Amino acid sequence: MRILNFILTRTVNVIPHEKLAAARKLVLQNCDFVVDIGANNGQWMSTVRNHGYNGKAICIEPLEKNYVKLKSVKFHNTVTMNCAVGNKNGYVYMNRASKDGESSSILELDDYHNIGAPDIKYIGKEKVRISKLSKILETNKHKKIFVKIDTQGYEFEVLKSINKSNFNDIYAFEIEANLVSTYKNSTLIEDLIKYLRGKGYQPLRIENGFGMPNFGQQLQVDILFVKK
């Protein structure tokens, strides 16, 4: 863990929220379409609109209760979609988490999550539709897409659902990444970075996310990637 922190802090900046927000705002000026995967109640999209982005967007949220709240917000120039995103088309069962469902995932909680947030529990399962991102973007005509992925350990399955044509059109990613296994069978940060570097993207900024400060352990970070 110390080695990984050493590498990260010397290749990209680990910075407070307002600085990542400033970087995101600059990147959005070069984008003509925003895809919000794991939109929850629309919190992140609200931030994007507050940045001054007025272009087209889609918010994607799988859980029905959260989707109803999301749809009621009625963001300007934004469509909504009630489904999960992953490397298959069909249906899956999703674990619904307590506290407004922000930790809900297709994957099971792992020990680090249970220790870091003992008040978060799964309270049921919900059958949801799942679609590849390539299918969602199959009629896309935009050439500078910003994709945000917050899928609680399922991020790599979303990335694998993107085809070559989509990658040509995607300018930036913002991804929640795990430094340790907070969800069972989740992909860790080093593999996400390696994969996206191989697709022609580089990390621009890293922001601290979920952690256990009393133990000195960071669990998750948000990473902003841009095309080289």
Regions found by a protein language model. Give the residues of each.
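Phosphate/nucleotide-binding beta-alpha loop and adjacent structural elements of enzyme active sites
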Residues: 1-228
